[in-house]
Curated annotation (Swiss-Prot):
Ca(2+) 3 binds at residues 133, 135, 137, 144. This is Putative calcium-binding protein CML23. GO terms for molecular function: calcium ion binding. It holds the Pfam family EF-hand_8. Potential calcium sensor. Keywords: Calcium, Metal-binding, Repeat. Ca(2+) 2 binds at residues 52, 54, 56, 63. PANTHER family: EF-HAND CALCIUM-BINDING DOMAIN CONTAINING PROTEIN (PTHR10891).
Length: 151
């Protein structure tokens, strides 16, 4: 596996002692420096075990590149999951947003809830909206709806 210049640069910065290998300690220190978060020992050891294909307890450049590539691929899958969640939320939002205003109003909420068998008056719907109406305009935007649904 041929590492790109970017991977080589990152590998070089992680390999603090210049021995051509990244130890668990070097990995943890560099993750903390890069992300500002301390990585628990268990996570460091799990990453090392996952990537250390030759079993020497260290990551050479090829193992490091493979690890980073796999982590990027996992991140892409999470983005796909996020995209699917967002798509589903947009579909749900569209069901409640019936007035063509791009937001859920107390009336549109009342109408949809009635269709679903829950009968509330407009004031009760206003109270429901108020809990997640971040900007206080009396309606729910998609972002506010998303926050509500993810709570």
């Amino acid at each position: 596996m041929v590492a790109s210049d970017e991977f080589r640069r990152v590998f070089g910065s992680f390999d603090q002692d210049g021995d051509g290998k990244i130890s668990a300690t070097e990995l943890r220190l560099c993750v903390k420096a890069s992300l500002g978060e301390d990585m628990p020992d268990e996570e460091v050891q799990a990453l090392m075990a996952l990537a250390d294909t030759d079993g020497d307890g260290l990551l050479d450049e090829e193992e490091f590149v493979r690890l980073v590539t796999e982590m990027e691929a996992d991140g892409d899958e999470e983005e796909d999951d996020d995209d699917e969640t967002c798509r589903c939320l947009r579909e749900a939002f569209a069901m409640y947003e019936m007035e063509g205003r791009g937001c859920i109003t107390p009336l549109s909420l009342k109408l949809m809830l009635s269709k679903l068998g829950t009968h509330l008056d407009v004031a009760e719907c206003q109270a429901m909206i108020c809990r997640f109406d971040m900007n206080g305009d009396g309606v729910l935007t998609f972002d506010e709806f998303k926050t509500m649904m993810m709570a």
